[in-house]
A protein has these predicted regions:
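Hinge/lid segment of periplasmic solute-binding proteins
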Residues: 39, 107-161, 176, 185, ...
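Long, aromatic- and glycine/proline-rich binding clefts that accommodate carbohydrate-like moieties
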Residues: 302-305, 353-407, 415, 443
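Glycine-centered hinge/linker elements that transmit conformational signals in sensory
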Residues: 183, 187-194, 231-261, 307
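Bacterial N-terminal signal peptides
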Residues: 12-24
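Short, solvent-exposed loop/beta-turn-alpha elements that line the ligand-binding surface or hinge
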Residues: 123-136, 205-208, 223-243, 293-300, ...
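Conserved N-terminal structural module of periplasmic/extracytoplasmic solute-binding proteins
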Residues: 2-6, 18, 26-118, 126-134, ...
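Extracytoplasmic/periplasmic substrate-recognition and gating elements
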Residues: 46, 66-72, 150, 169-173, ...
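Pocket-flanking alpha-helical
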Residues: 58-62, 84-121, 133-153, 163-164, ...
């Protein structure tokens, strides 16, 4: 495809290589060994990629990267690693400052890398790609941006959440599918049957769970509240936070949430829905993939619907998976060219198709592609415009992700539900924790 970056801003690599070869032809090799070999030696890029739990998609992208290398005369050293493999390697890289040339960057590390100045600016690439397919979705465009409008990464795909509902249970009670969070509570009470090990709502609230942060934050935005303000300062102390805590507590007190909910990890609500002990829960497409491949009977009893709305609208806290180029690279221009190539729509399309719906598009018009017209997948695609990064309504900063990783919202919720604290006391503790994370990064 044709790219739109200005040639005056970056000379294409092939021209640079050609010029180098012409110069080398006119200049005698320096004394000593290796003069001729050095002039023709291929540049090499070390690239770290992450597994996506969809091997076909991983293979598709690996092939794209290798094909780009062959076409541009670049040696590719590509390592695609699981989370367990990546964690120690990233720890070593951070400690030694010996980074790959470019990589899929861990979400918690991206803002820190930006703050520490170890990434190459990607604004030019982002501007070029943003001209394609209707431009990036709002969340994808903002995920690696700083307050000065500069970009430091390029998005590859996103994830969002939907609501899974036991429509057969609702039909037994003559109830319509929920549109709002108030509907969720009403329905949960109607279908609740704890004597037979069935609870109306599989609400995520476990402190070892990232899903708990996603769920609470999505509901908080829907109720008109926010964890952080536009400038990245704590904003949890609000009437909207108190309203939401009261709402969830009413569900907890009514017994419509499984009593072991506070102990759930990220797989807790998946297991609860898949074992048919809850009537509703939020999740990514992972439950859908399980039902389609492992439990057709439960799939037929399930409705996949958008996240319920609150007084302020419909929101979900999602993730935007980013790649970046490290300033330690000897070939930053090559890395930027590679990212512009593999994250253009014509390369992402086969990657998404190979993923079978696991990865959601980062371009607006790609949400209209045929693969997203399947009814269940379409619900996922339709939630993308409602998906926001963790720092919403501002930018996602290092302190915001530190607080996220510390499960600050889930801890606050459990203070109220499990420990019996008042809203004011729980909010005060959470606000102090948020302020601590904020202050640490201002020093």
């Amino acid at each position: 495809m044709a790219f739109h970056r200005k040639a005056s801003l970056r000379v294409p690599f092939v021209l640079v290589l050609l010029s180098a070869l012409l110069v080398s032809a006119c200049v005698a090799p320096a004394p000593g060994s290796g003069g001729q070999a050095a002039a023709t030696e291929k540049p090499k890029l070390t690239i770290w990629a992450a597994t996506t739990f969809t091997p076909d998609a991983d293979t598709t992208q690996d092939d794209q990267i290798k094909a780009w290398g062959e076409a541009n005369g670049v040696e590719i050293d590509l390592a695609r690693m699981s989370q367990d493999e990546r964690t120690p390697r990233w720890q070593t890289a951070i400690e030694s400052k010996q980074f790959p040339d470019c990589a899929a960057i861990e979400q918690a590390d991206l803002p820190k890398f930006i703050q520490e100045g170890v990434l190459v600016e990607t604004t030019e690439v982002m501007q070029a790609l943003n001209e394609l397919e209707g431009g990036f979705t709002d969340g994808a465009f903002l995920a690696g941006q700083t307050a000065d409008g500069k970009h430091w990464s390029v998005p590859s795909f996103s994830s969002t959440e939907v609501c899974y509902v036991r429509k057969d249970k609702l039909e037994e009670k003559g109830l319509a599918l929920p549109e709002t969070w108030d509907d969720v509570l009403t329905i949960a009470q109607a279908i609740n049957d704890p004597d037979n090990q069935f609870w109306g709502w599989g609400k995520q609230m476990g402190t070892p769970s990232w899903d708990s942060e996603v769920s609470f934050t999505a509901m908080l935005w829907a109720f008109g509240g926010k964890t952080w303000d536009e400038e990245g300062k704590p904003a949890i102390n609000s009437p909207e936070t108190r309203q939401l805590l009261d709402f969830i507590k009413s569900a907890w007190d009514a017994g419509v949430i499984p009593p072991d909910g506070p102990t759930w990890d990220d797989g807790g609500n998946n297991r609860a829905y898949q074992s048919e002990i809850v009537g509703m829960t939020l999740n990514t497409g992972s439950i859908l993939r399980y039902l389609q491949t492992e439990d057709q009977a439960l799939l037929e009893k399930t409705a996949v619907i958008p996240i319920p709305a609150g007084p302020a609208g419909r929101f979900v806290s999602g993730y935007y998976y980013q790649w970046g180029v490290f300033s330690t690279s000897a070939h930053p221009e090559l890395c930027l060219d590679l990212l512009e190539h593999i994250f253009a729509p014509d390369q992402l399309r086969p990657f998404y198709e190979a993923g079978g719906g696991n990865m959601l598009p980062v371009y607006k018009e790609m949400l209209n592609d045929e693969m997203w017209q399947d009814p269940a997948r379409k619900v996922l695609a339709d939630m993308v415009p409602n998906t926001r990064p963790q720092g919403y309504p501002g930018l996602t900063t290092p302190w915001i992700l530190d607080a996220w990783m510390d499960h600050t919202m889930a801890k606050m919720l459990n203070r109220v539900l499990v420990d019996g604290w008042t809203n004011d006391d729980a909010i005060a503790e959470a606000e102090a924790a948020l302020q601590k994370w904020y202050d640490q990064w201002q020093q």
